[in-house]
Amino acid sequence: MACMRIYISGPISGQDRIRTVDRFNNTARIIEEAGHRAINPINIAGWGLEWSTYMQIAFDVLQSGEVDMVYMLSGWEESTGASLERYMAIIKGIPVEYQSAEDRKQYKANGGSNGKV
């Protein structure tokens, strides 16, 4: 399998900093151990920016043509930012995969890996 560039999406704003950074970094490590390149938004943007700045950075990355897949961490549906990243991926035709088995089942049943908006 070719090396894919996988953008990690999930709740960040309003979350515990240490747990969130660990969660994203652990996910990135798993992706990289599988031979892919992880695109970790926390490493790109850091911590403590305004929400709108984070979203502009995320949209720029997703529109860059440098993302082959978006990986949605569990709890994404509770996050406006992660939901918008998912929507942007769907619009751009970027495949979306889900950490949660329940999400994978629900969204694949509704039209493939991109699910429904």
Set out the residue ranges of the language-model regions.
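Conserved catalytic or regulatory cores that recognize and/or transform ribose-phosphate-containing ligands
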Residues: 1-117
